[in-house]
Each structure stands twice: as structure tokens, then as C-alpha cells.
Amino acid sequence: MDYTEKLTRYVANFVDELAKSGVTDVVVSPGSRSTPLALVFTEHPSIKEWIIVDERSAAFFALGLAKKSNRAVAIVCTSGTAAANYYPAIVEAHYSRVPLLVLTADRPHELRHIGAPQTIEQIKMYGDYTKWFHEMAMPEASDKMLHYVRNKASHAKHVAEEGNPGVVHLNFPLREPLTPNFSLDAIWGTKSYTRQNIMQEGTKQLAPNQLQILLEEVGPNKKGLFVCGPQADAEFADAVTSLAGKWGIPVVADPLSQLRTGQHHKDNVIDGYDAFLREAEIRQELKPDYIIRFGAMPVSKSYLFYVMENVETQQYVIEPNEGIRDHSSNQTTFLFADPTTLCQQLEQMTVVDQDVSTAWLKTWQEMNQIAKHYLLEGVEEQITEGEAVRGLAEVIPDGSTLYVGNSMAIRDVDTFYMTSPKTINILANRGANGIDGMVSSGVGASADNERVTLLLGDLSLFHDMNGLFAAKHYKLPITIVLINNNGGGIFSFLPQAKDKRHFEALFGTPMDLSFEQVAKLYEANYNHVKTEEQLKAALYESYQLDGLSIIEVKTDREQNVQWHQAKWQLIKEAILKDG
């Protein structure tokens, strides 16, 4: 058996086992050393390949695809700095718990550390951001080695998705010649080699005595508060809102919790909290007896102030798997159990009498209604960033996905995207919270050909402009709502804005770019809108079109700050007056 046959069978058995383990998509960036992986993935009948030239964009595309599908996506690149360009997306995947299979080609061992071209240190190059690293053996095709390569494939996929999902890195040292021979018989292996390991996990639950202790400490007839951070389980919304309804307590719902949209019970859902928790005097009126938080911390800084001011309040954090995600410094009990199952069990165990007090819930509901009234009222002659979110929420198609950029975009969605009977999957890269890779992530989420609306700022689009190529090349159904305030709008809300000498150069960073020309470059449908009605019309039009659309909303940074502050002041005055 010559080396080409060994290489072909080795790589083909690896790829076939990934497919049998459930991997359906691979994102490939061109390169020579990765030729065997790229060609074999492309030839496999059960795996869809996506070709994206820039590795940084490719990795974020895969991240968006994996986040949307809740399953591992493979990425393939050649040796050298190509692999280094994956780093930002790997960091984001680690912190936001998204499963990625990173498959890097490498020079064989005899070419390392001697100055061979395109050769860098790839062993554990992503450090602690991976759940597992493995240096693959050199290609061989003995029965033992084909069992080995299949075992590593199935194990890699399982590790990426088990527990807290994350990144697995397999490094493939490959010698020349690199081109596989697809004329070989039984290239995908024989039946005896397939499905080396079948791995299944059960649902993690608290023991009955733990549930009873928890129920005695919390439950109805106390001023409790549910807080819901980002969630991916479609059944969670029904479970937590049903329990909240039985206990008569409010549910603070981050936009990524999936509680603001859908058909579940929403009477207890509080969506305007970011606006009214800004005021210290209001926060003082809302001291809870306990807080139960599901998932990571919400986006809202106002909520962070609130929870940190209630340092003596017992806080419980419910996570499906081990790991601490809490920077409030509060006394916290971490309970590692499936959140949906826990809510269902607590509801079944709860016996509620007819005298459950609703005063605590009503206080939150009344403040919430006041906040929503002022946040949603009025129509400006020139569209504001908050109105852009309001208009988007009104016309976005039921059953579609909203991918939200970081910085001001996610904060405006937190403030202005209110509860709706539509079912909208709201996603964002809130692991490391960077603005890089946002275009590619949103485009990746549209890879299943279901409509995605991407809301982001001009710096985010500029930072990842070449992410538009995949949308153009594959004609993916994505509408980009571009909030162009000509720079870093969020800094205008921060203390840095007070130093006028260096603010524009260091923080405002105006670029004066023509995004209409960007749209032309990538053959996108383009609209520039000036009012909320124009935005809604442009959105509706884009949803009838195929492929990529860019809708530009131009705003002024200083006016945007003043508009937000005026809203917050009206809410503060109205709540304190009623109180």
C-alpha cells in the first residue's frame, strides 16, 4: 500500500466518522497542506462544505452556524498563520459555549523548528480556550490505525458538544504528496470500522432532598425574582414562566433568554427593567428576598448595579453544567442542573394557597408598563437608534432569527425590543463581547437558508466587511440593518466623552465611509432610510427578496445620547411620582 492510499483511507475514515457522529457542515479555507482534508470533506455525500478564503471570517461563520443549529461545525485550514486567524472566534466560542471542531493541517515533525516555510508552533496553540487538543498520528491505513482515527473523530465531536460546549482542536501533520486517490474502493471504510463509540448523556437533576431544601428557602409568598440570561433550550420559556406564574413573581428577561418572544405566558415577564433600574432610588424600592438566575448574567448594566446593591440577598445561579459565570460578588449558591427540568420539578412540588400576595409582582409590572410607555412613545422626524429597534421588532418575520451586534446594538435591543407573540430566535456573541466577526457570524446563522436579520453598527460592519462575501457567494437570505453613527457610539455614553480634546480621535473614530459603495461591491440590495416608516418598508421589501440586503440608518452620536437620556428621565420622574 503506497502513501497516497494510506493518506486517503486515513482521512476518509476520519471524515466519515464525523458524519456518522452528526457533523453536517464544514467551513474550509483554501491552502495546500490541508488539501487531503479539504478534498475528502468535499467528496463526502453527507457533509456540506462552505469555502471561505479568510480564516478569521471562516471561523466566525462556523460559530454563527453552530450557535444557530446547536451542533458542532468543523473548520479546516492550512498550516501557519492561517490557524492563528481562527483565534478570535475560538475565544468567543469558548466563552459563549459554542461547539467548534478546529482541524488544522501542519507540517510533519521532520519539518518543524528548522525554518521550513509556513510552519509555526501549532501544538496547543489555542491554550486553555480548547476543551481538548490532540496531535493526530501520521496517516496509516492498518486496521488499528483506522480504528484509531475513527475513535478520535467521534470523541472530538462528543467532547465539543458534551457538558458546556466548546472548542476541540485536532492538529494533522501531513506529508507530501497531499492529493487523495478517490478511485480506491470502499473509501469510506467498511461497516466494521464505523461508529466506534456511541456516547449519550442524561439530564442533570437535583436530588429530591436538594429540591426540598431549595423550595423551603425560596418559593411563593416571598419577594423572589427570576432572572434569565441567554438560553438555547426551546422548552425553557414555558417552564420558567409557568413556575413564575404559580409563585407570583417577576421574571427579568434578557433579550437572549428567548422569553421576550414566543407563545408562552408573558404576564410576569419584565422587559423594560434596564430603563427603570438605572435610578438608585427606584432600585431601593425593589429589594428582593432572593434571586434565582438562570444562565449567564444579562446584558444590562443597570441590573448589575441592582444585584450588587443587594449583596445580602441570597442568589442562586442555575446552570446545566459546572462553571462559574457571576461577577456580582454576591453570596451565591451555584446549582448545576437542567434549568427546564428544575422549573418543572419545583412547580410540581409547589402547593400554593389562595392567599399568595401579588403586591411584589404588581410593583414590577407597574414600573415596567411605565417604562415601556415612554420607551415606545413618539415618532421622531429623523429616526433614532431606539426607533430602529422598535420598527425592526414590528416587521421581522415570525419564525426568523435576529442576530445582534455588540456595543450599542445589543443594548438598544435590551432596552427597546419588547415582548411579542412572534417566535424570534435572538442571538448574539456575548462570550467575549467583541465587535469582530459579527458579519460573518450573522451570515453563518443564515447558512440553513432561513431568514436572518443582522443588527449592528458601522464599526462592526467595517471590522468584518469581508464577511459579506459568503452572503454574496452563496446567496444567503440575510438582511443587515446598519446603524451608522459614524464611529463608536457607545463611547458617547461613557466618561471618556467628557474629554473633548482626544475623544473623536481615540474613541469616536469617525470613518466617513460610503456603505452604499460597500453594498455595490458585494452586490447587495441597498436602502438608506430616514424615518421609522421608511425602515419598516425597506425591511418588508428585503424580506421578499433573495440574498443580501443592507439597510442603512444614519444617526448622530450626540443627539442619540440626548434622546436616550430624555427617555430615562421621563421614566424616572413618572415612576417616582406614582410611588
UniProtKB/Swiss-Prot annotation:
Keyword Magnesium: yes
EC numbers on record: 2.2.1.9
BP GO terms, sorted: menaquinone biosynthetic process
Pathway recorded for this protein: Quinol/quinone metabolism; 1,4-dihydroxy-2-naphthoate biosynthesis; 1,4-dihydroxy-2-naphthoate from chorismate: step 2/7; Quinol/quinone metabolism; menaquinone biosynthesis
Gene Ontology molecular-function annotations: 2-succinyl-5-enolpyruvyl-6-hydroxy-3-cyclohexene-1-carboxylic-acid synthase activity; magnesium ion binding; manganese ion binding; thiamine pyrophosphate binding
Record text on subunit structure and interactions: Homodimer.
Name recorded for this polypeptide: 2-succinyl-5-enolpyruvyl-6-hydroxy-3-cyclohexene-1-carboxylate synthase
Organism: Oceanobacillus iheyensis (strain DSM 14371 / CIP 107618 / JCM 11309 / KCTC 3954 / HTE831)
Gene label: menD
